[in-house]
Regions:
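Active-site anion/phosphate-binding pocket segments in diverse small-molecule metabolic enzymes
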Residues: 19-20, 39, 57-64, 130-351
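Active-site-proximal beta-alpha core segment in soluble small-molecule metabolic enzymes
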Residues: 1-155
Length: 351
């Protein structure tokens, strides 16, 4: 996905961890990368070596970063961005300590103040968002008034973008929107945006069996057949990101119709009751869609999120690395990536 965004003209990328940033560098991404969450000061050398910007969100972390970079005065400059606390309550420098932090970064050897950012708590709450934007502008404006070159300022993410109300400043950080998805709480409120989902989740059965009435399905069991039933076993379980909370609460699409997923979700499998699917009996060559569209039927990430009492972010980001990714361009499959980098050992479930 990053390569596609790179080719489309993204100015840079934000990630959560240094490992993710390194993975992008090793994949050939040369544009700026910012790690949003704290890194241990002892690995600051690796960030400097790979030209990866890091975030300082509190005094202890900043002091550690400055000490680590000061010990290597001849190494490449480490870019640091400050997280500002504007109301999320998760981290960042507030109005009382932001100036000292920015001043220390600006005057330290081997370090450059490259930006400041915050994160909006509830983009759909106009009053709360306005207060956070005002706090951010006030803190960053005070730094500029006192002679600090703040660098790139950014606070808007997917929610602001799809509402058409993004305070872009010097950049925006679309996350869920890069999947073509609208944040759950903004469904129905989003401005026209041309987004369409680009992620779908598919599986083919590894077994389809006719079972008698009274058969318990999966561990527990939490589901027992009340009639002779045809049950398909799909090779997708909670180790793949299909949460156990979806047990007996989700559906799949097959041949353009909905079928219930029955029994407790196992580590590596979930079962579908295909007894009522019309036509020839469902077999191992039938394709099931767990997220996405088949014919006129659709199961969205938000549908799955509602079934497991979470949000779409958790649904799409917890699909495990062992689920093969099939990348498309203009609706044509172009590349399949697995844990071993190609189609060797490919499983029957895919995203």
């Amino acid at each position: 996905m990053t390569r596609a965004l790179d080719a489309a003209g993204a100015d840079g990328f934000c990630v959560a961890t240094l490992d993710e940033a390194i993975a992008l560098r090793e994949a050939g991404i040369e544009k700026p990368i910012l790690v949003l969450f704290p890194i241990p000061p002892e690995v600051a050398r690796e960030a400097r070596r790979r030209s990866i910007a890091v975030t300082a969100s509190d005094r202890r972390l900043l002091d550690g970063l400055l000490a680590a970079t000061g010990a290597e005065p001849d190494a490449p400059v480490l870019e640091v961005q400050l997280e500002l606390e504007t109301g999320l309550g998760r981290g960042g420098f507030g109005a009382g300590d932001a100036w000292q932090a920015a001043s220390d970064v600006s005057s330290a050897p081997g370090v450059r103040l490259a930006g400041a950012w915050t994160h909006l708590q509830a983009p759909g709450d106009d009053g709360r968002t306005a207060a956070q934007v005002a706090a951010f502008e006030r803190i960053s404006g005070d730094l500029a008034a006192r002679g600090i070159a703040v660098g790139r300022r950014h606070l808007a993410a997917s929610g602001s973008l799809v509402l058409g109300e993004a305070v872009s400043l010097d950049g925006v950080r679309p996350g869920l929107a890069t999947y073509g998805l609208v944040p759950d709480e903004l469904l129905g409120r989003a401005a026209p945006n041309g987004l369409r989902p680009v992620l779908s989740l598919h599986a083919r059965p590894v077994r389809v069996a006719d079972l008698p009435a009274g058969t318990g399905i999966s561990y527990g069991p939490s589901f027992t057949t009340a009639r002779p039933s045809r049950i398909a076993t799909l090779p997708l379980g909670y180790a793949d990101g299909w949460a156990r909370a979806l047990s007996n609460r989700a559906e799949a699409l097959v041949r353009g119709g909905r079928v219930p997923l029955v029994g407790n979700v196992a580590m590596d499998a979930v079962m579908a009751d295909v007894t009522d699917v019309p036509g020839e009996p469902v077999g191992v060559h039938d394709e099931f869609v767990l997220i996405g569209q088949q014919g006129d039927a659709v199961i969205t990430a938000a549908d799955v999120a509602a079934a497991r009492d979470t949000n779409s972010w958790e649904v799409v980001t917890t699909i495990a690395a062992r689920v093969p990714r099939v990348y498309h361009a203009a609706s044509v499959p172009r590349e399949t990536r697995t844990l071993v980098g190609d189609e060797v050992g490919r499983r029957s479930a895919r995203a």
